[in-house]
Amino acid sequence: MTDAAVSFAKDFLAGGVAAAISKTAVAPIERVKLLLQVQHASKQITADKQYKGIIDCVVRIPKEQGVLSFWRGNLANVIRYFPTQALNFAFKDKYKQIFLGGVDKRTQFWRYFAGNLASGGAAGATSLCFVYPLDFARTRLAADVGKAGAEREFKGLGDCLVKIYKSDGIKGLYQGFNVSVQGIIIYRAAYFGIYDTAKGMLPDPKNTHIFISWMIAQSVTAVAGLTSYPFDTVRRRMMMQSGRKGTDIMYTGTLDCWRKIARDEGSKAFFKGAWSNVLRGMGGAFVLVLYDEIKKYT
């Protein structure tokens, strides 16, 4: 293998392992966030059974579905997240070579900053094309509030993908893809761009204390998450449309979804579950720091 291939493989492995560990740790927060986001578009959750907020959700889930249900959809998330993050991190460096070749970060700061934004956004959009059906399945499994057996909408990851494919075709597995690309570019641009720029401005980036790295990463994930959150809410709502027919369809398209949420639920609805998303972001910050630490030993 060439040095470039070895470097690519190390990036892929380090990013994937770090992501899988952190995602499993914050899976309960992730499920709470998803339920709050999509409950208005769920056929299973009627108006009288909707969750009032994070606390109500955390209290009711173990009572109604069991403690292990906090990790519902986590397997799909780990399977999805491993290649997603690994591809993001690996392609990020490839895109950096394209956008940042010959750029001096000390004398060409804004060009350096713009290059980091572009490389982060392009990496996120590229990987999304490959793993979107897994992201779709993770959302639908997490939104499934049935206790067990016949009450469940899907038996598992494979069952979810097969049922939606049979009812809606490949299009059903990519429901909400367009708005996802918009959101992922905004999120990844901030996630990678600001983080790399901030670290690059430090006196000795490779020997920065892990606490400083974590603080930078935490701030970046919080800002990036809140900035792109409305796009995430719309894409999750669109994912819930797959499998519906006729009068069951709530939104005719992405623009209709934006319009109806704003009209019927108010602008605050775009940020439902946002606070739990900030908490979940601690896992994202941990990924960035852990990735840098793993690379030091590979």
Swiss-Prot record:
Note the segments forming the Solcar repeats.
6-98, 111-201, 212-297
UniProt GO MF annotations: ATP:ADP antiporter activity; oxidative phosphorylation uncoupler activity; proton transmembrane transporter activity; ubiquitin protein ligase binding
Modification type N6-acetyllysine: residues: 105, 147, 155, 163, 166, 268
Q: Name one Pfam family in it.
A: Mito_carr
User: What's the name of the protein?
Assistant: ADP/ATP translocase 2
Q: Which residues lie on this side of the membrane: Mitochondrial matrix?
A: 38-74, 131-178, 232-273
GO terms of biological process kind:
adaptive thermogenesis; B cell differentiation; cellular response to leukemia inhibitory factor; chromosome segregation; erythrocyte differentiation; mitochondrial ADP transmembrane transport; mitochondrial ATP transmembrane transport; negative regulation of mitochondrial outer membrane permeabilization involved in apoptotic signaling pathway
Q: Phenotype on deletion? A: Mice show an apparently normal embryonic development except pale phenotype, but show a reduced birth rate. Postnatal growth is severely retarded with macrocytic anemia, B lymphocytopenia, lactic acidosis and bloated stomach, causing lethality within 4 weeks. Mice develop anemia in a cell-autonomous manner by maturation arrest of erythroid precursors with increased reactive oxygen species and premature deaths.
What is the phylogenetic placement of the source species in the record?
Answer: Eukaryota, Metazoa, Chordata, Craniata, Vertebrata
What do the Gene Ontology cellular component annotations say? mitochondrial inner membrane; mitochondrial nucleoid; mitochondrial permeability transition pore complex; mitochondrion; MMXD complex; myelin sheath
Residues passing through the membrane, by range: 8-37, 75-99, 110-130, 179-199, 211-231, 274-291
Post-translational modification comment from the UniProt entry: Trimethylated by ANTKMT at Lys-52.
Q: Where does ADP bind?
A: 80, 92, 235
Q: What is known of its domains?
A: The transmembrane helices are not perpendicular to the plane of the membrane, but cross the membrane at an angle. Odd-numbered transmembrane helices exhibit a sharp kink, due to the presence of a conserved proline residue.
Give the coiled coil ranges. none
Q: Which residues lie on this side of the membrane: Mitochondrial intermembrane?
A: 1-7, 100-109, 200-210, 292-298
Location within or outside the cell: Mitochondrion inner membrane; Membrane
Modified positions (N-acetylthreonine) are 2
Q: How does it sit in the membrane?
A: Multi-pass membrane protein
Q: Which gene encodes it?
A: Slc25a5
Tissue expression: Widely expressed.
Tell me the residues on which N-acetylmethionine occurs: 1
Q: Which residues carry this modification: N6-methyllysine?
A: 52, 147
